């Protein structure tokens, strides 16, 4: 589910989480209609659910979705990833072996869940009504589950890492070990940032990024451990907007964690918004963030990918070099909705991915109108994994 469909579930989500009923909502995070309807992607919908008691796990790309969707817990989960940019992207991925997948399933927990069902042989009280004398105490009784949950997730990530050779953590750091400028983000922008970080560090800079996987419950100690001690400037990127708030959700969580640990004296912290309604976030946007962090007085609040000539929050983006892996071939096709261009390109990339050793990536840009609108197909092929979740702007083939 996603967007308004997810928001309609919020009253039930409070009950599901309150009764500790294990379930998973897989959410391709999409925009919630505000001043206008938009069917495309950002984190507006999942951020509206963060107070329900659901745990929240975020994946950055297609491969991570395949790997991390197997994590289980008594606490219900929202397992989310970027709508359209990740959910509609075609990539070559390594899939689970079913024997390995079977080992990830705790059958004792399944049996315990089944025994929790309504049964006259196992009577229990449900749907109770409580007054002010005991409601508060019972509401606090779930604390232990949420305190233990990050360790449960870490345990399962450890199993995944052991079986698949990955390195998933609650917060993954990427970049120079002695970075002085760091970005914190979650979702597909992390892959864009990885390419920029590789380029900048290869040219003498010292930058890095913390990728958030487990967003709720938020483990501040794990986040702080992931930030290099050398960091002097920090930018937190959110893919949502809360009008009237002092900052966006992830930014406020990070600021609180830093304040409680007395780390504010060590670094500047700024927050930005990006990608609302699937606005493209190219490498130029990430370069602009690192450039802003160099300043003595950077913007406390900023936006990426647009030109804000009203409130002047946008960062200036300059022409930047290509950061995709050497040897990547980029192709761009224009067509009209319904003319077969998108379908032909989907089949072509799947054939090349299935029958060659090439890595492939396909993403299709189109509007939300009926048949006849312009479609743009963005295809990439290469000998190295492709981490480029943004539109092609320097095509080898058109």
Model-derived features: positions:
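Glycine-/acidic-rich phosphate or pyrophosphate-binding loops and their flanking alpha/beta elements
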Residues: 158-181, 314-328
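Conserved thiamine diphosphate
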Residues: 39-83, 95, 107-110, 256-275
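Anionic-ligand anchoring segments at beta-strand to alpha-helix junctions in alpha/beta enzyme folds, i.e.
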Residues: 177-178, 182-213, 327-394
